[in-house]
């Protein structure tokens, strides 16, 4: 019997607001909270929740089923704030024991280019959050 590994990457980029030249030095808040919330809600409603609901059912119904997730720290923060039901579904999937979680740089950035120490710190930071939220050690 052939085996496959289903790997799911969850990341959400942070949207920056329009920042005009004349705002330099006056406005130091760069994030577009409205667009960030809209984007994560849209993605959660149309992608994450339906897919994770299906994966949870598959985990419960099939003894041989396994899947793997990699979440960026940025995505975790946005999901906790704007779409906590996605975190709840991931926790339920983790509780089945049929999901592995991988570690990556917290910000889903290019930390490995800068320095090995920076890369290790980013990965350790995310690994800590995954353990805290889902009760499993990332691999």
Where are these regions (language model features)?
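Catalytic alpha-helical scaffold of carbohydrate-active enzymes acting on polysaccharides/glycoconjugates
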Residues: 1-138
